[in-house]
């Protein structure tokens, strides 16, 4: 799961990245890499859920909140050093993996889901990055995505899906709804694809390096019956439990959304009409995907090509 599979060709990566417009300008990049001030740091500390299990460093958010008068200046300097360098030290980026059972009758590894317990300092730095990144993504992620962004609720996605199903049933339309559950979606994400996307979207070199260091310098240790295994490194994937992961996953999933929208705009994929000038093509909520298809053989072929391409790029199944 942690090893990188054979990568898609550079041409395939570039072809997919070109579906995105460049949406980060010079002013946006200045804001992304501006100095971290005490007020921003306090806001980040206050945004964390309390009583979380600590990572390998043993520190908790409550520790820094309670002792901010004493430690605040030093903590701010650590975050600022990371920002100015555009890098996070590997020593900050060690992570415990705890296996959480999906049911009371878990008997095999497939019955467990991994949760990452990151170092507290890492969580603080990555949350600073995530808050700044979210301000840009909120206005750019397509309306078909309903996860991780303020103002987008799952009940809205459910309502749209019901409308599509209702149209198929009551208007005697030919069509199909394809439900896709992305297997181990976070674990299979390609780092190469993330780097290409960030570059193409116009993010600055320093900000990209800052993000990629969060992803690529990580080392893992698995907790088994409370005992930690030796640390090892990964070559792909995003951590469930890292503040950055939901937003980076949004970007990865946005590639699939844009590919379907491009096919629609080019007249190669129509989806299902729910009104004279309104059609539904797809909905995404985290790792759950609904695709609405007319059932036409040509459209089915287009959809197959899109899914095969993204299977190569992110190694989704």
Protein language model features and the residues they cover:
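Residues that mediate protein self-association or partner binding, especially
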Residues: 1-5, 45, 53, 68, ...
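Short helix-interrupting loop/turn segments at helix-coil junctions
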Residues: 2-12, 51-54, 73, 85-91, ...
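Conserved polymerase palm-domain catalytic core
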Residues: 182-286, 294-301
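Conserved pre-motif C helix in the palm subdomain of viral-like polymerases
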Residues: 110-141, 159, 235-266, 311
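Surface-exposed loop/turn segments and immediately adjacent short secondary-structure elements
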Residues: 1-110, 120, 124
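Inter-domain linker/hinge segments that demarcate the starts of reverse transcriptase
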Residues: 30-46, 72-83, 97, 128-133, ...
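Conserved catalytic palm subdomain of right-hand nucleotidyl-transferase polymerases, strongest
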Residues: 52-59, 108-117, 156-199
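Catalytic palm active-site di-aspartate
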Residues: 55, 94-97, 113, 145-147, ...
């Amino acid at each position: 799961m942690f090893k990188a599979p054979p990568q898609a060709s550079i041409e395939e990566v570039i072809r997919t990245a070109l579906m995105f417009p460049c949406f980060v300008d010079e002013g946006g990049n200045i804001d992304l890499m501006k100095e971290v001030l005490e007020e921003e740091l306090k806001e980040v500390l206050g945004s964390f859920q309390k009583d979380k299990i600590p990572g390998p460093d043993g520190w908790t958010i409550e520790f820094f909140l309670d002792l901010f008068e004493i430690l605040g200046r030093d903590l701010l300097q650590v975050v600022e050093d990371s920002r100015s360098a555009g890098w996070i030290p590997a020593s900050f980026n060690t992570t415990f993996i705890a296996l959480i059972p999906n049911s009371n009758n878990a008997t095999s590894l497939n019955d467990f889901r991994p949760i990452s317990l990151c170092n507290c300092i890492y969580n603080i730095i990555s949350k600073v990055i995530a808050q700044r990144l979210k301000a840009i993504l909120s206005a750019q992620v397509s309306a078909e995505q309903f996860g991780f962004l303020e103002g987008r609720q799952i009940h809205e996605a459910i309502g749209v899906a019901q409308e599509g199903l209702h149209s198929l049933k009551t208007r005697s339309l030919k069509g199909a709804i394809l439900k896709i559950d992305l297997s181990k979606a976070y674990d299979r994400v390609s780092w190469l694809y993330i780097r290409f996307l960030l570059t193409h979207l116009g993010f600055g070199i320093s900000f990209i390096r800052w993000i990629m260091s969060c992803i690529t310098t990580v080392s893992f240790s698995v907790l088994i019956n409370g005992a930690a295994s030796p640390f090892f490194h990964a070559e792909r994937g995003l951590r469930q439990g890292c503040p950055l992961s939901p937003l980076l996953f949004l970007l990865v999933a946005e590639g699939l959304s844009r590919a379907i929208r491009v096919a629609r705009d080019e007249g190669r994929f129509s989806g299902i009409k729910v009104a004279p000038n309104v059609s539904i093509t797809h909905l995404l909520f985290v790792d759950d995907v609904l695709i609405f298809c007319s059932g036409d053989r040509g459209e089915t072929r287009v959809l197959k090509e899109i899914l095969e391409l993204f299977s190569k790029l992110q190694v989704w199944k």
